[in-house]
């Protein structure tokens, strides 16, 4: 499935009953969140609010509200097929030369996909059909949602922020929330280790006192949106990865106010700059943890141009206690992570981020253990191999006879195979999400690893327990007479 733009995707969703148009007037202030939250929890469709109260622009919510829609956005039929996306990323992260003709033939599909990586630059684009600049720039014309009662102000949640560092050829795409503070002002809330923040830091060092160009695309095609939240290798741009997902090159157009390139098919583009040193207090906001976060200072984004389609759609979401859209994305992207981790650690059998763990804060790993201390090596690997897991607070490692996605199995392993003193690893003073108010210092906290594997010689001096297993011959005999026993139908019928 290939989508040229967001509207192609919406057309398909509507054909498959995965999009609901809402003609009743609904307020972006709290009401849309209430409707979207109820719909997502019921596994319902994407929502297109066609008549937001007080605005002329439709609002799209709950676009990736089910794992299947995430898979569809990546060009796959179902979530299990996302393992293939992960295998492609693992190949791109550490490409190996073909070992022979047969291996070359097997890898031809991957090499063919790589041809779609370069972007296609356009002179004009749908996202620039209407242009607002100077005094005509007014962010308050956009139906930006206020999601929770104690939120500080309306909040842009699905903006693809485009940046480029002074020493980098490729652009970075990241999704950072942006608080509305004026008709042409937003607060750019990015964490210090994220790509956009790193680009800004490098710019300030290379060009002291100069304005940092920035652009935000709203309503891009699904491959580009999902490319911005997928663990692509640092050497690969999100635009290139989107081209791989889509099967065609990503079309971009140069901004009117800078050399940055934005998705040509985007619904809305905000162009402007960050003035070094201009900061503002951001928050509080209800977040994916289920709590309001504390107020902190972040850079101010001054918008100089708004470009958009003639009949633009505003793409939005809300975040709150799981399940929410980030949690659903986490469930789907979990399948992408598995092959990437297995490429580096072949002993890993499965990797699971439970959605109730707020997307990434707790991970369960199952593995084929091969030596004493092996589980601890895998723990450290999870924390360090991919940048996405530097904020993961808890890593539970189990043997491959445990189902990582079944809490009954995992809790059984923890309670029967762990000694708390021996098998708990605590690491202090590590990077932690700023939103994690449980950490003693903002941005710095501890991590816990739980080794719930069977212990090998050297890890214990005791005889280790053997799991109880049924006699297969007895099981087969009882299977043969089970219906005749009629235990669950009061003896009435077979």
From Swiss-Prot:
GO terms for biological process: ubiquinone biosynthetic process. Its EC number is 4.1.1.98. It is a peripheral membrane protein. The keyword rRNA-binding does not apply. GO terms for molecular function: 3-octaprenyl-4-hydroxybenzoate carboxy-lyase activity; metal ion binding. The active site is at residue 287. Mn(2+) binds at residues 172, 238. Prenylated FMN binds at residues 175-177, 189-191, 194-195. Its cofactor is prenylated FMN; Mn(2+). InterPro entries: UbiD, UbiD-like_C, UbiD-like_N, UbiD_bacteria, UbiD_Rift_dom. Gene3D superfamilies: Single helix bin, UbiD C-terminal domain-like. Coiled coil: none annotated. It is an enzyme of class 4 (lyase). It catalyses: a 4-hydroxy-3-(all-trans-polyprenyl)benzoate + H(+) = a 2-(all-trans-polyprenyl)phenol + CO2. Catalyzes the decarboxylation of 3-octaprenyl-4-hydroxy benzoate to 2-octaprenylphenol, an intermediate step in ubiquinone biosynthesis. Belongs to the UbiD family. PANTHER family: 3-OCTAPRENYL-4-HYDROXYBENZOATE CARBOXY-LYASE-RELATED, FERULIC ACID DECARBOXYLASE 1. This is 3-octaprenyl-4-hydroxybenzoate carboxy-lyase. It comes from Citrobacter koseri (strain ATCC BAA-895 / CDC 4225-83 / SGSC4696).
């Amino acid at each position: 499935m290939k989508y040229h733009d967001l509207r192609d995707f919406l057309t398909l969703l509507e054909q498959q009953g995965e999009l609901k148009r809402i003609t009743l007037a609904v307020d972006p202030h709290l009401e849309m969140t209430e409707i979207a939250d109820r719909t997502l929890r019921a596994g319902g469709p994407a929502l297109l609010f066609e008549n937001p109260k007080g605005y002329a622009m439709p609002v799209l919510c709950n676009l990736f509200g089910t794992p299947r829609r995430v898979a569809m956005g990546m060009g796959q039929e179902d979530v299990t097929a996302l393992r293939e996306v992960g295998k492609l990323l693992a190949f791109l992260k550490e490409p190996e030369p073909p070992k022979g003709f047969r291996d070359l033939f097997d890898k031809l599909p991957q090499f063919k996909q790589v041809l779609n990586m370069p972007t296609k630059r356009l002179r004009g684009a749908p996202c620039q059909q209407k242009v607002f600049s100077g005094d005509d720039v007014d962010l308050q014309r956009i139906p930006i949602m206020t999601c929770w009662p104690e939120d500080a102000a309306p909040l842009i949640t699905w903006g693809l922020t485009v940046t480029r560092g002074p020493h980098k050829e490729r652009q970075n795409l990241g999704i950072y929330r942006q608080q509305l503070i004026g008709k042409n002002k937003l607060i750019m809330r990015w964490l210090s280790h994220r790509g956009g923040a790193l680009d800004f830091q490098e710019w300030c060092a290379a060009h002291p006192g100069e304005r940092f160009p920035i652009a935000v695309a709203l309503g891009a095609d699904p491959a580009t949106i999902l490319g911005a939240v997928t663990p692509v290798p640092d050497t690969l741009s999100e635009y290139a990865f989107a081209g791989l997902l889509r099967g065609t090159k990503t079309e971009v157009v140069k901004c009117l106010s800078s050399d940055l390139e934005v998705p040509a098919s985007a619904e809305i583009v905000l162009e402007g700059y960050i003035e070094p040193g201009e900061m503002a207090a951001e928050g509080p906001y209800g977040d994916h943890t289920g709590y309001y976060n504390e107020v902190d200072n972040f850079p101010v984004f001054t918008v100089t141009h708004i470009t958009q389609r003639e009949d633009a759609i505003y793409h939005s979401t809300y975040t709150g206690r799981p399940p929410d859209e980030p949690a659903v994305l986490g469930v789907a992207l979990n399948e992408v992570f598995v092959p990437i981790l297995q490429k580096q650690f072949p002993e890993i059998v499965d990797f699971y981020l439970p959605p109730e763990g707020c997307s990434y804060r707790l991970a369960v790993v199952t593995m084929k253990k091969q030596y004493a201390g092996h589980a601890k090596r895998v723990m450290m690997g999870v924390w360090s191999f991919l940048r996405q897991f530097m904020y993961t607070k808890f890593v539970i490692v189990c043997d491959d006879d445990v189902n990582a996605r079944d809490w009954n199995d995992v809790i059984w392993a923890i309670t029967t195979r762990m000694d708390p003193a021996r098998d708990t690893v605590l690491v202090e003073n590590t990077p932690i999400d700023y939103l994690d108010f449980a950490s003693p210092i903002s941005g710095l906290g501890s991590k816990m690893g739980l080794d719930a594997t069977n212990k090998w010689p050297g890890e214990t001096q005791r005889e280790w327990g053997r799991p109880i297993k049924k006699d297969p011959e007895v099981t087969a005999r009882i299977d043969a007479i089970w219906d005749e026993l009629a235990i669950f139908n009061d003896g009435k019928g077979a």
